[in-house]
Swiss-Prot record:
Main location: cytoplasm
Subcellular location field: Cytoplasm
GO molecular function: tRNA (guanine(37)-N1)-methyltransferase activity
PANTHER family: TRNA (GUANINE-N(1)-)-METHYLTRANSFERASE
Organism: Chlorobium chlorochromatii (strain CaD3)
SUPFAM superfamilies: alpha/beta knot
Protein origin, superkingdom: Bacteria
GO biological process, one term: tRNA N1-guanine methylation
Protein name: tRNA (guanine-N(1)-)-methyltransferase
Protein's UniProt keywords contain Transferase: yes
EC number: 2.1.1.228
Length: 231
């Protein structure tokens, strides 16, 4: 799988791409990640990429010329399954969306910055808009990393335990169950006996009940959504 990421602060990605899961995936040859500096396509001597908004108001807006030039140059080299803009008013990033995107080959991510991007970019170039929540950040770099991490961990061969990602929270519409490890008794707090029994069927029943209970308490909206989809 390949990611091409467009950003006005490309150095933001340096430490993350040389450590952790994304670095492991790259070393295994499962993922390619390329960061492109939008300023390389900027205008004039100072490589300008932003300007004041028509109509006045606070903040700056990313100009269309650099973005069109960058994306068109990349599209001339390969086909992208999706050109994604990270924005607060996009489709909410949830597990089913990450699952779908993990089956694609080439994704192009545009990180917003400043107040906004020129609307003509969204109308003509962007095929998908994704939000990580109802909150405004200083740029799309953190959402881009979140999106890549959510996708990459689903690619077969990336995680040491291939089933780990398939049993995470949200994969079946529920939060994950509670987990315990050694010691079995810590300061009088004991691990549930069923988890020590070795009886796998009983363990799975306990985990299902635990997942349902945690979801009911912490995210009842997930149960309501599942009920609506069922009926």
């Amino acid at each position: 799988m390949r990611f091409d990421v467009i950003s006005v602060i490309p150095y933001f990605f340096d430490s993350v791409l040389t450590s952790g899961l994304l670095n492991i995936a790259r070393k295994k040859g499962e993922v390619e990640i390329y960061i492109h500096n939008l300023h390389d396509y900027g205008l004039g001597r100072y490589k300008q990429v932003d300007d004041a908004p028509y109509g006045g108001g606070a903040g700056m807006v990313i100009r269309p010329e650099p973005v069109f030039a960058c994306i068109e140059a990349l599209q001339a080299e390969r086909h992208y399954d999706a050109v994604i803009f990270l924005t607060p008013d996009g489709e909410l990033l949830e597990q089913p969306l990450a699952n779908r995107l993990s089956r694609l080959e080439n994704l192009l991510l545009l990180c917003g910055h400043y107040k906004a991007i020129d609307e003509r970019i969204r109308e003509q170039l962007i095929t998908m808009e994704i939000s990580v929540g109802d909150v405004v950040l200083s740029g799309g770099e953190i959402p881009a990393l979140m999106l890549m991490d959510a996708i990459v961990r689903l690619i077969p061969g990336v995680l040491g335990d291939s089933e780990s990602a398939l049993t995470d929270s949200f994969q079946n519409g529920l939060l994950d169950a509670a987990y315990y490890t050694r010691p079995a008794d810590f300061r009088g707090m004991k691990v549930p006996e069923v988890l020590l029994s070795g009886h796998q069927a009983h363990i799975e029943q306990w985990r299902t009940a635990s997942a349902l209970e945690r979801t009911k308490i912490r995210r009842p909206d997930l149960l309501e959504r599942a009920w609506r989809e069922e009926f």
